[in-house]
Structure formats: structure tokens, C-alpha cells
């Protein structure tokens, strides 16, 4: 996270014009030394403490974050929401605080020119995020037709063929698995499967489904 303040990259790095993303980056800077200590990691309530630290929105934390963000503002090329990936591809900047889909886009764009970009996650912490569709209670109310239309739309974009089209266009992996239909898995394997014969498959199913009494899953 300290990269955003590194003078070596003065005006050669961009940050997100987003309260959530930039505030978290600052919290990451402020807490990374403590989080990486064995004493912190070996606590019985590690997850609760981690969440408490990174999601701290006390007046003092916000005030401290504001001062750090002012320094970041002086060091970065810009705060952006969409132009950062183009600036990275063109070489205008050398690093960009990106969402994963923008990272995929940037890497694919320069790959054809023989240039390799890397996507990295800070060792101490990062934020977990997702985009989703919501049916607003205030918007639908008791209108059955509106509810049916909203549900039909969600069903439509959740079809495996449309999920693949969306993933191809936006560069993000969907949470939709497709059930018995393997279209989505086949696409992911085709696009992102390892080409290294020495690679090892690692089963992450435990992270996405309940295992007995273990509730530590998404």
C-alpha cells in the first residue's frame, strides 16, 4: 500500500476516485506492520481483530486518513475511475490501483506487444468486493409485474451463455457456476488456465461452501 506514497513513482501512479477503495488503502498502510506480526496473527480472535482494524471509521481514523490522502494526492498522477487502465497501457503511468477486471484488461492489451504487466496484492491485507444486482423494495413495492420483470432480467443475465459474454466484455469472473452446464468453467479454463506444466491445482471449494460446522466461507 505504501507504493501510493513512494516518491520514486511521483506522478507515475494513479489511485481510485472512490472513498471505499482509497480509504481502505490508507487503512492498509496504517495497519500493515501490526497485521504482519505473529502476535497479531496468532490471536484467537484474529478475524474479528482484522475486521475491526481495517473497517475502523472512528473520527480519529478518518482524520488521520484525510491527512495521508492529502499526501497521496500530491504524489499520484490522478484519482480516476476508468482512465487508469488506459494510462497504464500507454505508459503514462507505471502503476495503478486497479480493480481486478481492469488489471486483466491492461495485461491483455499490452501482451500482444510483448509487454508484461503484473497484478499484485499487498501481503498484509486487501479488500474483498463484488458487484451485484439488487431489486429495490422501494422501486418494486407490491407491483408483481415489476418484480417479475426484475427477476426475469436477473435470470436472463445468469444464463451460462450470457455469463460468458459478460465475463468476456468486462474481464471479471462471475459468481455464477452454471450448475450442470460446464460452459462457464470451460471458458475460464480456456482464458485463464495455466500453461505451465509444472502448475498444481489447488482446491478452493472449502472457501465457497460450508464444511460441517465450519462457517468460514463466502
Regions found by a protein language model. Give the residues of each.
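Tryptophan-centric aromatic hotspots in well-structured domains and transmembrane helices
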Residues: 1-5, 99, 129, 172
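Extracytoplasmic ligand-binding site segments that recognize negatively charged/polar headgroups
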Residues: 1-83, 87-89
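Sec/Tat-exported extracytoplasmic proteins
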Residues: 8, 17, 30-34, 72-76, ...
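An acidic- and aromatic-residue-enriched active-site/binding cleft used to recognize and process polar
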Residues: 18, 122-124, 169
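Extracytoplasmic/secreted proteins, especially bacterial periplasmic and envelope-associated proteins
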Residues: 21-24, 60, 64-67, 71, ...
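Charged, glycine/proline-rich intrinsically disordered loops and linkers
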Residues: 33-63, 186-217
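Extracytoplasmic/periplasmic substrate-binding proteins
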Residues: 74-142
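Mature extracytoplasmic/periplasmic domains
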Residues: 135-213
